[in-house]
Amino acid sequence: MPGLLREHCALTHEGDGVFERICDKTWWGHGALFGGYVQAVALSAMTRALGNAAQAPQSMTMHFMRPFHDGEFRAETTVERTGRNMWNVSARLYSAGKLAGLALASFGVWREFNEFRSLLPPAEAPVGPDEAPVVTSLGVPTHDHFDMYPRIGTFARGGGDAHVGGWVAPRDLGPIDHLAIPVVADLWIPAAYHRWSEPSPAVSVDITTHFRSPLPRADVPPSGSVFVDLRTAGSIGGFVDEDVDIWSASGDLLAQSRQMRFVHAI
């Protein structure tokens, strides 16, 4: 089964590297399409533009210039470079006819060469067989497609550390693949919200995602849990950063993400 996310990342090829779809509010965030979902749709377009399944995405950067609304989505892609081991694709992303984002992705053939791992997975308890998920209070529709189990910090505002995380279990997402990773990386309530006692919406300025494992994996089934670990260095000058590590239940690093958010004053 392709899963709901892959269905909602499907695009129509209009020719000359142009891909389009009509987006609804299934993957909705704070008054606009969820940033991780937009990144997934952009990656879907760039992957199709490259046209070779052996060339897996290794890194993707996206800058958000204005909100992405439901309705017409358009990606104008360009294969910037093709090589023996690396390929680069860019995309100009439009929402309702306006330029709303820019994306650049690097693709490469997975090679096991000179490997080592120095980052250790979080030593947190797995999801219990009868454990109930914790529902967030943000009212973000995208959260309805996941069950979340906090392990580091809580979903409460104020009084906490800028380090949060826990298990994420998709309900109807489909396989945890390269399209799912940007959504999962952007899913958890931001670590900064744990520090702020008063609500201050923070929206994505840019997101960079590094894919650190071949995907999908047999040990990460569609309904299986992955662990997200989020840290924020600081909220400074009206912008707040966030680093995210995504781990499999077996302790393998699946992806890393970093983003900067614009903090709105209320």
Regions found by a protein language model. Give the residues of each.
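Terminal targeting signals and extreme-terminal segments of soluble enzymes
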Residues: 1-266
